[in-house]
Every structure is written in structure tokens, then in C-alpha cells.
Regions:
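A short, structured beta-strand-centered segment in the mid-to-C-terminal lobe
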Residues: 532-542
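CBM-like carbohydrate-recognition segments
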Residues: 571-572, 584-585, 593-610
């Protein structure tokens, strides 16, 4: 049996030969790795360095070696260099046209690469001395480039490349994505008629984006007040693509539009149909909750209680089930049924202790918050996932980068039964390595890998990975100076930036606590601090100190954490308006009547995260009954 790190030994022997100028010996070692270790996470690197070794040895097989690497790892970090060196190798063999085509791939697919300028220079030189054929870069390259530009918010550049795609004889290969993306670009610019045209061209293709296009068509129809067309699009989406995550959302939006214009009966009917059809989805479970809400707003508390109890049963395992049981308890209180109220609160508190309404229910009952902890070990036995075994060996040897690479490979290769445990290890690795944003995202992937109803019952290590104590010394110091709860601040930072100090929002908010420059400067003056420049805004200590000052000011102004968080998210002027619209509303009702869904969710999520931080790190994480 080979040692666990045998592939690493062979790989680094090849690297040593390469560094010593013994290129053919290096190529032989990389060949050995590729032949003997078919599950090695180093195969991509071995392919690349094999090609580089052959090129350095001026072996005529070098172009084919680069091609082999690019076929399998065309989007890898070494791809721009591989295309450039492939061009160099082809030039050396007098294959000018093929060399030019290799160079062309770099500025199209890797414009920001340091090899892009060199590739353009070589193309200029070749064009001066040879007659080059037309650019035959595959249409997929321009489509992928357009997607990258689109995701970066550069709509104009994306549009230009998509037009190039459409002019190609092979445009049909990517028509679905092209039509959809052009529709979204028009939607962004509020050119809804043109957006509709693109989406309607995409839907009949019945490919990857057909459900997305139907969803956008639903939204466009609602914007235009065409509820009938919106319902037709949403119904088609739910019928043709019932497994799409957008299926329930489209119907929900139509029902919501009906409720907003006062057609509560029609809205209630559609909410009920949507919820009962998609009870375990986010929007289906929310639709079930909305049925009870509409009934309660008209004073029909008994019917509302029944609707919420039914919603809690149908959407069991979802976050919405917790809110349904909580509001079923409130409705039961309204009709004088203390027994039903107590039972419903208890269900929310014990089954969904990690949710906002589960935590609120525990507070109503005067019981400590408890969250279900999975007692099973998160450890994966040796031999089950070879890449994980290599991670353990490398980690013990303090080979940090290689160890992390093996753990990343293990997260992709692990059997389904072990994937959540491997992802949890990777999450902790990222957080301990100074990347809590990536750590939280990976922990959420781990939670999702478990599936329902497991998301509310996790190993303790996974709970801690979901709620890491990043920047904790800075948070506690700033909280103490401002007289704030450090756990509330941790919850706010987790939701604002996921602890990424360099985060910058589309609106121009900076840093851990997402401060607008003007707000940061005025707060700095009030605290007797120098006004921060852009560098100061992303400095963790400065950002947290100023963010604590902003949050403290809102707490002083409004006196309640829900109102302060609403002001932090949407501004104090809007909070005052909402308070005038609903005078005397208690905290629960106030939150649910906020017209901005983002702010409603923000208040709940920040307070839920704060409660989880207290449970984990202050209260000693008492567990719910197993």
C-alpha cells in the first residue's frame, strides 16, 4: 500500500527537476503522477507542469501537452500562461495560424491576465510578417466573457459581446443564455418592452433559463399592472417547471400584488393554492403564512389561528413553520385559548430554536433558548476519502496551502454521507485562515448538504462554523465603549458583510458594518475621531468603532432594538413614517408591517444571529431535548 502522500512526493520531485533545469526528468515525474494517481488533487498542476517541462525542453509534443491541460482545466489559474506558452511553442514550430489562435484566446477570455498584453504584442508581430486567418475563437468564449462582464455589473461590455455572439454562425449553441442575459440587461435599463421580446424568444427553447425568463415576464407584467398576464406566466412557470425554485415565487408575487391593491379575497385564494402546492419551499411556506396574516388583519383571529396551525404542519422543517406556530400562538391568545397558545409557542421554541420566531417563542414562555445539537461525530474515518487523509497528513506537517487544497478537493469528492462533515472542516479552515466570509458560505453549504429537517439539528462544530467569532476582540472593545451588546454587533456584522473587511456594496457602503462615507464622517465627528478616508473605512477597528456609534445613536433615538436595526438598514426617516402608519404597534406587528421585505428580513436575521451568538458563546450552548 502506497503512503498517503506518495502523489505529493512524486509531484515535488518533478518540481525539483524542473527548477534544476532537468526538464525531461521533470516531465517523466509528472507523467508518473498522472499514470499512477488517478484520484490525486494534483493532476491539474501535473498536467500544466508536464506541458511546461516539454516546452522548456523544446519537445515538439509541447503544444499537445498544453492542449491536454486546457481541455481539462481551461478555467484554471494557469490557463492564460498555458495559452501563451502554447502559442510560443506553435510559433517555434512555424505554425503561425495556430499560434495566433492560441494568443487570441487570452485577451478574449482572460483580459485582466498579465499575459494579455504580451499576447496582443505577439499578434501584432505575427500580423506584420504573416497572413493570418480570421479569428475563429469559439462563440462560447465570448458568451462566457459576456457572463463575467454581466456578473461584474458591466452591462455595456456584456451587451457588446452578446451582439458578437448573435452574429456568429454558431450562435445557436448558446442562444438560451444569450437571449436570457440580453433580456436581463434590458430589464435593468427599464426597457421592459425589449426585455419582454428577449425573454419570449428564450422561453420556447425550453432550456436552462426558460424558468428564469418566465419569472422575469411575470415581474414585467406586474410592473405594468397586467395581473392577468402575470398570473398566466406564473402558472406556466409552475406547471412546466414545478421543481424550479422560482415556481412558487412567481405565484407568490401575483398574490402579493393582489393583496397590495386590496383584493384580499383573491390574494388569499392564490396564497393558499401556492402554499399547498409547494409547502416545503421558501415561497410556498411563506404563502401559507400570508393566509393567516390576511385573516388576522381583518380581525378573523380564530380562522387565522387555524390557517397558521395548518401552515405549521404543512411546512414542517422550514423557517416559515416557526413563524406560523408563533403567530398561531398569538392568534390563540386573541381568542382566549391559552392552552393552544402555550402549545404553539412550545412547538416553535423546541423545534426551531435556531430561528427568529423560535427564539421569540422561547422568550414568550420564559424558557431558555435551546437549539438541537446532533450528537453524532462529524469525523470521517481514515480511508473513506483519500484526499481527506492527505489533508490530515499535510496539516500535521504544517503544509498549509497544500493541506487546504486537499481539503477543497475532498469537499468535491466525498461521498454524500460524508460531504457535510468535510465541508464543516473546510469552513473552520477558512475562518481560522482569516476568511470568515468563505467559512460561513461553506458552512451553509454543509448545512444544505444534510437536507431537511436536518438544518435545525446540526453538530456543534457546524453551528460554530455558521456563527464564527471573527474580529471578536475588536467587537467587544467597541461594544464596551458604546454600551452595546457585543452579540448584537456580531450578528449585525455577520449579516452586513459576513466579516469581510473589504466588502463594498453596490450602494457604496464600506467594510464590516457597511458604512456609507457620509454617515461614517458625521459619526466620526460626534465621537471626536478624525474623518476616515476610504482606507480607514475598510480598517476593521475604525469601521467597527464607527458602526457601533451609528447603532448606538439609533438605539438612543428609538429605544428598541427592532426600530434601531430598521433605522440602520433603511434610515431613521422611513422608520418614523412606518411608526406613524402603525401607531402603537408592538414589535412583532411593527416588523411584519414594514413594507420593505429587505428590512423585514434584516431585522429578523440580525436578531436571530445575535441570539445564536449568545447561545454558543455566552450561555454554553444548552441543547434541546434529543
Amino acid at each position: 500500500m502506497l503512503p498517503v502522500l506518495a502523489d505529493h512526493a512524486v509531484y515535488y520531485e518533478g518540481v525539483a527537476y524542473f527548477d534544476a533545469g532537468r526538464f525531461r526528468d521533470g516531465a517523466a515525474k509528472f507523467d508518473e503522477l498522472l499514470t499512477r494517481f488517478r484520484d490525486s488533487s494534483l493532476r491539474g498542476l501535473a498536467l500544466f507542469w508536464r506541458a511546461e517541462s516539454l516546452w522548456s525542453a523544446r519537445d515538439p509534443a509541447a503544444p499537445d501537452a498544453f492542449h491536454r491541460y486546457l481541455e481539462q482545466w481551461g478555467d484554471g489559474r494557469h490557463a492564460p500562461q498555458a495559452w501563451f506558452d502554447m502559442g510560443q511553442a506553435l510559433e517555434a514550430q512555424g505554425m503561425w495560424a495556430d499560434a495566433a489562435q492560441a494568443y487570441r484566446r487570452i485577451p478574449w477570455a482572460f483580459e485582466s491576465s498579465p499575459y494579455a498584453a504580451s499576447a496582443k504584442l505577439r499578434l501584432t508581430v505575427l500580423a506584420q510578417s504573416h497572413t493570418l486567418p480570421p479569428d475563429t475563437t469559439p462563440v462560447e468564449v465570448f458568451y462566457e466573457r459576456a457572463k463575467t462582464e454581466f456578473e461584474a455589473g458591466d452591462g455595456a461590455a456584456a451587451w457588446t459581446d452578446l451582439q458578437r455572439v448573435l452574429s456568429s454562425p454558431r450562435a445557436w449553441v448558446v442562444n438560451d443564455g444569450t437571449f436570457f442575459t440580453m433580456g436581463v440587461l434590458m430589464y435593468w435599463e427599464r426597457r421592459f418592452r425589449e426585455a419582454t421580446s428577449w425573454f419570449e424568444r428564450d422561453v420556447p427553447l425550453k432550456q436552462l433559463h426558460a424558468d428564469d425568463s418566465l419569472f422575469y415576464l411575470t415581474q414585467i407584467a406586474l410592473r405594468g399592472g397586467r395581473d392577468g398576464d402575470a398570473l398566466a406566466y406564473a402558472t406556466r412557470l409552475a406547471t412546466d417547471y414545478p421543481k424550479s425554485p422560482l415556481a412558487a415565487q412567481g405565484l407568490f408575487l401575483v398574490a402579493e400584488a393582489r393583496a397590495e391593491r386590496g383584493a384580499t379575497g383573491a390574494a388569499q385564494t392564490l396564497y393558499k393554492e401556492t402554499g399547498e402546492r409547494f409547502p416545503k419551499t421558501l415561497w410556498g411556506s411563506r404563502a401559507l403564512w400570508e393566509v393567516g396574516w390576511l385573516l388576522s388583519r381583518s380581525g378573523q383571529w380564530s380562522a387565522a389561528r387555524d390557517a397558521w396551525a395548518r401552515a405549521g404542519e404543512l411546512s414542517a422543517g422550514t423557517t416559515a413553520a416557526a413563524s406560523s406556530w408563533y403567530w398561531a400562538a398569538r392568534a390563540a391568545t386573541q381568542i382566549g385559548r391559552a392552552d393552544l397558545a402555550s402549545d404553539s409557542y412550545r412547538r416553535a421554541a423546541t423545534l426551531y430554536g435556531d430561528t427568529y420566531y423560535g427564539q421569540q417563542a422561547a422568550a414568550k414562555l420564559g424558557m431558555p433558548m435551546r437549539v438541537a445539537i446532533e450528537s453524532a461525530s462529524a469525523d470521517v474515518p481514515a480511508g473513506v476519502v483519500p484526499t481527506l487523509d492527505r489533508f490530515r497528513e499535510l496539516d500535521a506537517l504544517a503544509q498549509t496551502d497544500d493541506a487546504t487544497a486537499e481539503l477543497e478537493a475532498a469537499s468535491l469528492l466525498a461521498p454524500a454521507a460524508e460531504r457535510a462533515a468535510v465541508l464543516t472542516l473546510l469552513s473552520v479552515r477558512y475562518t481560522q485562515g482569516g476568511d470568515p466570509r468563505r467559512g460561513i458560505n461553506t458552512a451553509e453549504d454543509a448545512r444544505d448538504a444534510l437536507g431537511a429537517p436536518a438544518p435545525h439539528r446540526l453538530p456543534l462544530a457546524m453551528w460554530q462554523a455558521l456563527y464564527p467569532r471573527a474580529q471578536w476582540p475588536v467587537i467587544t472593545q467597541a461594544a464596551a465603549r458604546a454600551g452595546l451588546d457585543p452579540y448584537l454587533m456580531a450578528g449585525l456584522i455577520r449579516e452586513e458583510s459576513r466579516f469581510d473587511p473589504s466588502a463594498v456594496s453596490a450602494a457604496g457602503a464600506y467594510g464590516l458594518m457597511q458604512l456609507m462615507p457620509g454617515t461614517a464622517q458625521s459619526t466620526a465627528r460626534s465621537l471626536g475621531m478624525a474623518a476616515p478616508d476610504q482606507r480607514g473605512l475598510v480598517d476593521p477597528a475604525t469601521n467597527i468603532t464607527l458602526g457601533a456609534g451609528v447603532l448606538k445613536a439609533e438605539l438612543v433615538r428609538f429605544g428598541r432594538s427592532d426600530l434601531a436595526l430598521a433605522a440602520y438598514n433603511a434610515g431613521p426617516n422611513l422608520v418614523r413614517r412606518w411608526m406613524r402608519d402603525h401607531p402603537g404597534a408592538d414589535a412583532d406587528t411593527f416588523v411584519e408591517t414594514i413594507p420593505y421585505g429587505e428590512t423585514r428580513g434584516y431585522i429578523k436575521t440580525v436578531q436571530q444571529s445575535a441570539a445564536m451568538y449568545r447561545w454558543l458563546y455566552q450561555d454554553g450552548h444548552p441543547a434541546a431535548a434529543q
